[in-house]
Amino acid sequence: MTRLAAAAVAFLTLFAVDAAAQKLTGLKPAAVLPAPVALDTTGMFLAKFARVGDDVFIGGQPTERALRELQAQGVTTVVNLRTPEEMTRSVSFDEAALVRSLGMTYVYIPMRGNAEYPYSPAAVTKFAEAMRSTNGKLLLHCTVAWRASHLWGAYLIKERGIPIDSALANARAINLSDERPPIEQLLDQSLPTFGRPPHSP
């Protein structure tokens, strides 16, 4: 089996739900927060890709093939955090058009941590709305899952009431690093107000 074929098989196993899987989208998400499950997705995503529970996927930039596979496996909402400049410069296809042509909902929340595309509480609110309103599985992505991990961590703290240590550990298992400044901006509040991460200064 070629490496690409093996990666495709591994990709599909992400959707094999076991008894411990938890539904995290919708109006009544599971109370227990599952740990992210990561797999090698060579040829499908630019970088990291993980499943959290039964129905949330967080990763880097998906390929056209990845989006088609996701749609076939029940993903109905795609949330993109990349800026227009990033998409124009480095993505060879129109992601929004492809997502919509496949019958999925496209939610655009460009974030870069600058004046034009800041990390803001509004981004957390918009993502939370997407989590509540989707009628299927959801993909959250940026370039390498770094911004996506930070938004996920902020969402867990603000919208799900997950303790800061647990929220950051969950996001860190995807691709979170140097978490304090962007998450504080997303929450518009310093982390010590919510609790301080372990071993932090």
PLM feature spans:
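Bacterial N-terminal signal peptides
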Residues: 6-15
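A phosphate-binding catalytic loop at a beta-strand-loop-alpha-helix junction
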Residues: 138-151
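Cys-dependent protein tyrosine phosphatase-like superfamily
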Residues: 14-138, 153-201
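Positively charged n-region of N-terminal signal peptides that target proteins for export
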Residues: 1-4
